[in-house]
Amino acid sequence: MSGVATDDLFERVDAWIAQDPDPETRDELQTLVVEAQSGSQQALDDLHSRFDTRLAFGTAGLRGAIAGGPNRMNRVLVAQAAAGFARYLLDHTEGETPSVVIGYDGRKNSDVFARDTAELMAGAGVRAVLLPRLMPTPVLAFAVRHLGVSAGVMVTASHNPPNDNGYKVYLGGENHGSQIVSPVDAEIAARILEVAQGSVADLPRAETYEIAPETVEQEYIAATAAVAQTSAPRDAVSFAYTAMHGVGWRTAQQVFSRAGFAEPVIVAAQIDPDPAFPTVAFPNPEEPGAMDLSFETARDAGVDLVIANDPDADRLAVAVPDSSDASGYRRLSGNEVGALLGWRAAELASADAADGSAPFGALACSVVSSPALRAVADAYRLDFQDTLTGFKWVSRAPGLIFGFEEALGYLVNPETVRDKDGISAATALLDLATSLAAEGRTVADQLDAFAERFGFFASDQISIRVTDLSEIDHIMASLRSTPPAALGTVGVTQIDDLKDGFGSLPPSDVLRILLDDGSRVMVRPSGTEPKLKMYIDASSDVGSVAERRETATARVAALAAAMRELTAG
């Protein structure tokens, strides 16, 4: 719908421009005003898009395109967020001065947003500590606990498109450096809106913030290198590494070296931070084509593995040689890597247990991730926790020794980092690969061994993209009011509706459909895109590994077809 020119709109734009310290976004908005007042409908619609609503602060903080206006990421919005979060910390810290550590990645304006946050926090009376340079998100998450501060802020948009940026918030103390969960997000959001009633130009600033010592990164490197525990020669596995134009390499290189791994073959065009992300359309290892350059480098070098971090290095992608793929390599799914690392964690916990007693600890994954991890937990007599989507939930599982999400997120060292960490996960994966190499085996062989011991677990994800968000509400309502008795030829045995909570799970707009062959379908709206997502899982433990693979894969394909038909129209 086309917007209408109103005095109110232009007054709101003028008020925003008046408080904006960034000449780039000021000029951008002033140009749009001139064009809109001259009759440009496109400029007017753009202004309405920027000013009719604002970026919502939620449990994932803020994330959006860099541009002027309250519905974009910019210095005004970040100032409001920083001041609002400062008020929250001051309100919730008794008897001492609250403290916050602030980190930033290599995206456009990340350093500016971080310094603004440090100055505004210090001006508000919060002890602010700024990391000394751009660093991976896991280092910031580590620093919250290592420095013993009240909170953390990470300026990053992770693997979003190049023009995006974001603002992630962590809490220390009893939260152990995890990301925030409800209702904390709503409390912070309310204080941000209070700040937004005035001008950020009037907020007190101070340059009395501290710069964190270099030892913070070095302590992270030492703790992460210690994730490698095999006694086998650790330089036996060759691998290529890409930072996807992000900030992972400087830190990861030191971790790999300290752990004793072979020097990786780097994907040179992607190794240094570059906010333009020139070689990828989307800097997300899951996106088609994102790892093409990595595969080319790996083929030329003939390496055993490909290791990829996303731009802020909180995610890990792994690829193994595969002659049946045109690229020569196959990227493992997040569920495959999660299963292998979960099995590794269970083995380590079992080795630590004395006299055959049950090992201590819990394995955890989000409800949309593969049931394979539960099979591992059951086999090793470990606790298992399924959580809502997001590491803010996975990281809080009691007794956690390993957690993962299917979207390439893994938590392998909960004693130091309570968030997904692509560098420590890479260390654990390389540690596993080197121990396998000492036995003459590969990561691909270990996947077959997993299928032989626990069954073959197949997964797929399908999405329905809509132009009208009400379509998603309609589909979810229809599934609730008229639940299917069968999907294809497979009977439905149970449907769990998580909207009011289920078991230990908090309320969430998720449906879990269980079938009589043990398969499962999870249905939920996307939290970031106009999509309905369906996660399909099936397994088989009958026959050879090849037969198990064929059976489970066929079940997933049949369920995917049935769900597409059920939700069509």
Question: Model-derived features: where do they sit?
Answer:
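Glycine-rich phosphate-binding loop plus the immediately following alpha-helix
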Residues: 170, 175-201, 336-361, 365-373, ...
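Gly/Ser/Thr-enriched, mixed-charge loops and adjacent short helices
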Residues: 16, 20-25, 46-55, 165-298
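Short Gly/Thr/Asp-enriched flexible loops that form oxyanion-binding sites at enzyme active sites
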Residues: 113-121, 163-172, 252, 314-337, ...
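An N-terminal, well-structured beta->alpha segment
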Residues: 3-4, 10-117, 210-236, 247, ...
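Phosphate-binding and adjacent anionic-ligand microenvironments
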Residues: 299, 303-305, 309, 326-328, ...
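N-terminal small/polar loop signature for handling phosphorylated ligands or for N-terminal nucleophile
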Residues: 101-164, 255-318
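Conserved phosphate/anionic-ligand binding catalytic regions in large, soluble enzymes, centered on
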Residues: 51-71, 157-160, 243-251, 255, ...
